[in-house]
Each structure stands twice: as C-alpha cells, then as structure tokens.
Amino acid sequence: MRFIVIGAGRVGLRTARVLREEGHDVTLVERDTDRADRGRSDGFSVVEGDGSREDVLAKAAV
C-alpha cells in the first residue's frame, strides 16, 4: 500500500519508518528543508512544501 505522511518531525519519521518496515511505500511531505533532508537521508521520497496545499499534494501524487 502507498502512504503519504505529512510532516517529517519526530512523529512523522517514526510513523514513516514503521510503515516502511511493514512493507509499504512511503512518501514524506515536509516544508522545513532540514527535516526534508533528514527524511531523504533515511531513504524516503520527500516532497518539499506545505502539506495543506493542493499543488504540493499533487506533487506527492495524492
């Protein structure tokens, strides 16, 4: 299954890791560059931007 996690802070990254461990495809949406980079370094696909904006969600293929 494919999941989009909005926010790559402590809770968002933990959620993404658990989902990935369960075999799911996970994309993170994050507006903070440092957090986005952290998600990428953990091997996640990351879309940078505000997760409440429709254009950003479209980039994440929602």
Language-model segments: which ranges?
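Cytosolic regulatory regions of ion transport systems
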Residues: M1-V62
